[in-house]
Amino acid sequence: MFTSVAQANAAVIEQIRRARPHWLDVQPASSLISELNEGKTLLHAGPPMRWQEMTGPMKGACVGACLFEGWAKDEAQALAILEQGEVNFIPCHHVNAVGPMGGITSASMPMLVVENVTDGNRAYCNLNEGIGKVMRFGAYGEDVLTRHRWMRDVLMPVLSAALGRMERGIDLTAMMAQGITMGDEFHQRNIASSALLMRALAPQIARLDHDKQHIAEVMDFLSVTDQFFLNLAMAYCKAAMDAGAMIRAGSIVTAMTRNGNMFGIRVSGLGERWFTAPVNTPQGLFFTGFSQEQANPDMGDSAITETFGIGGAAMIAAPGVTRFVGAGGMEAARAVSEEMAEIYLERNMQLQIPSWDFQGACLGLDIRRVVETGITPLINTGIAHKEAGIGQIGAGTVRAPLACFEQALEALAESMGIG
């Protein structure tokens, strides 16, 4: 089909560029992902793993999900069914989904429905819980469970009804094109895009024939949840990268993800095969009372943003983030994006960055360039406490391990008969 890797890569990148993901709906995970109806099943972030291999925050999120679903009445009972192997685990990526941090998603949890209207493929992600103690970082107290019940019983139906009033939902490309000019890089900073989203949703929510108290609660939640758009950006990037993966050739990375134990990548020319290596631990700034020694190793599907070419690769779009993640100032942000541009093949002119002289965000992460230069993707990330139940303790950056890319390049060469 293709006469060279370069030709294949051009086709993959064009497929990604053509993708037009729209936010269409919010539905229970069980109605979108059939595997969640098969006994006690949870989705998790990262490449495949077992309960025994999980770190503290992911285990804490599993306990929380067991309590939320009513599989257990308390922490001890939840741990017992998890330890006894009664719960089946599936990577989010295996079912067209992504999840931040632990990525733990159960049947009753609401999920965003994002459809690439160009090709018809869909991607799913759970909803952002806001700040404080949250399940994605491993907390599972009654306050966390109460918030999840509210998201299921109030937030989901209101958002679904509001989106139902909008023809073809919300065009996320158009919204992100605005957001990136307003200082978002879509991983650690989403405040502008979340505000744009609120602007689009508010008139539709106000017109709903719903309980006024519920409408007020939803508006209050959206008004203070600066990272609400993150989960939409993740589903957007998943839908676009899955579109690229339809071209089963070339050396373009179509997924990067971490589970607190292993970092995994997928490559366009190698299908759904994972190439893994041990994760690194994020370095950054910590909330008062916490330190680097308490940081959990890297985890989460949110590196799908860097796979697409935003997040850490677009640090120059959000120089304010560099201080939050402990990476310096404006020149440091520029240096990061200039370095990342060396390992991506093209630019995404749909996402032009004013502070980068209106250059487009990076596009087309190439394993060949990573291995040749030794430059690995820089990922912006939240930092979880390594013990279950505590939650987020800071934010920082982390590098993908080079070994994943080396393994993938060797496998690609072998598949092409290059010895």
Curated annotation (Swiss-Prot):
Temperature dependence comment: Optimum temperature is 30 degrees Celsius.
Record InterPro entries: AllG-like, OXTCase_su_AllG_h-dom
GO-annotated molecular function: transferase activity
Consequence of gene disruption: The deletion mutant cannot produce oxamate during anaerobic allantoin degradation. However, the levels of oxalate, produced via a glyoxylate shunt, significantly increase.
Cofactor: Mg(2+)
Membrane-traversing stretches: none
Pathway info: Nitrogen metabolism; (S)-allantoin degradation
Domain of life: Bacteria
Effect of pH on activity: Optimum pH is 9.0. No enzyme activity is detected at pH 6.0 and 7.0. Activity increases in the pH range of 8.0-9.0.
Catalytic function, reaction form: oxamate + carbamoyl phosphate = N-carbamoyl-2-oxoglycine + phosphate
EC numbers: 2.1.3.5
Sorted UniProt keywords: Magnesium, Transferase
Note: Oxalurate could not be used as a standard substance due to its unavailability, and the enzyme reaction was performed in the reverse direction: the synthesis of oxalurate from oxamate and carbamoyl phosphate.
Role description: Component of a carbamoyltransferase involved in the anaerobic nitrogen utilization via the assimilation of allantoin. Catalyzes the conversion of oxalurate (N-carbamoyl-2-oxoglycine) to oxamate and carbamoyl phosphate.
Family: Belongs to the AllG family.
Subunit structure: The OXTCase is composed of 3 subunits, AllF, AllG and AllH.
Protein name, UniProt field: Oxamate carbamoyltransferase subunit AllG
Organism expressing this protein natively: Escherichia coli (strain K12)
Gene this chain is encoded by: allG
